[in-house]
Amino acid sequence: MAVTTFLFNAIMMAYLGEAGVSAITIVLYAQFLLVALYMGFSMGVAPVFSFNRGAGRYDRMRRIFGYCLRFILVSSVAILAVALALSGVVVGIFSTPGSPVYAIALDGFRRFAPAFLFAGVNIFSSALFTALSDGRTSAIISFARTFGFLLLGLLLLPRLLEVDGVWLAVPLAELLSCLLSVWFLRRKRADFGFGGGDLPRHGGRGGGRI
C-alpha cells in the first residue's frame, strides 16, 4: 500500500504538481467510499458460506453463490452509474467546486469510474475463498488487485498515456484481477460445490432451505 501510494503521489506531482496529488487523494477516498458496499456485503456473507460448507450443505452454497453473483453484478452497474451521474457531488464532498483541485479530480474520477464494474467481483471472491479456508487463493487475488496489477499499471500506463494513465491504472488492475478471480472460481468450483454434477462430500446432508 505504501509503495503504490508513493508512486501515485510521485507521478501526479511530476505531471500536475500539488493539485494533482490532492486530486488523486480525493479520487482514492471516493473509491473507498463507494466500494465499502462490497466490503460490507462480502464480510456479511462469508460466515454463511463457512457454516454451510461445514454442514455439507453444498446445495445451499450453490444457491447463495448465485444470489451473491447477481447482487454483485447489479450493484456494480448501479455504482458505476451513480459514480458517473453524480461524479460532481462525490468529488464535491472532498473539495470545493470550481477549484483547480476539484476540476482535476472530477476529470480523473470519471476516467477512474470503470474500476467499480470489476471491484465487487474481486472483493467478493477474495472474501469467499477466505471463508472456504483457501487463504492462498484469497491472498493471490488480494495481492494482485492492490499491488501486483496496480504496480504494473502505474509503471506502464503513464509512459503511454501520461496523466490519463494514472487514472486508468486502477481500472486496469481491477479488470485483470477480475479475470483472475473468474479463472479461480471456475477452476475451483467443483471443489466447493459451485459447479454442476456431483456435489462434494463434507460430512453433512444436502437439501433443505435457507
Model-predicted segments: where are they?
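Transmembrane alpha-helical core positions of polytopic small-molecule transporters
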Residues: 1-2, 39, 119-120, 146-150
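Helix-terminus/linker motif at the lipid-water interface of multi-pass membrane proteins
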Residues: 2-33, 51, 89-98, 159-160
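Alpha-helical transmembrane segments of multipass membrane proteins
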Residues: 6-11, 33, 124-128, 151-156, ...
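Small-residue-rich hydrophobic transmembrane alpha-helices
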Residues: 9, 23-81, 85-87, 119-141
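Membrane-helix interface segments
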Residues: 19-20, 135-137, 162-163
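Alpha-helical membrane-interface segments at transmembrane helix boundaries
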Residues: 21, 31-34, 102-110, 145
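Small-residue-enriched core segments of transmembrane alpha-helices in multipass membrane transport
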Residues: 29-30, 143-152
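Short alpha-helical transmembrane segments in multi-pass integral membrane proteins
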Residues: 49-115, 156-210
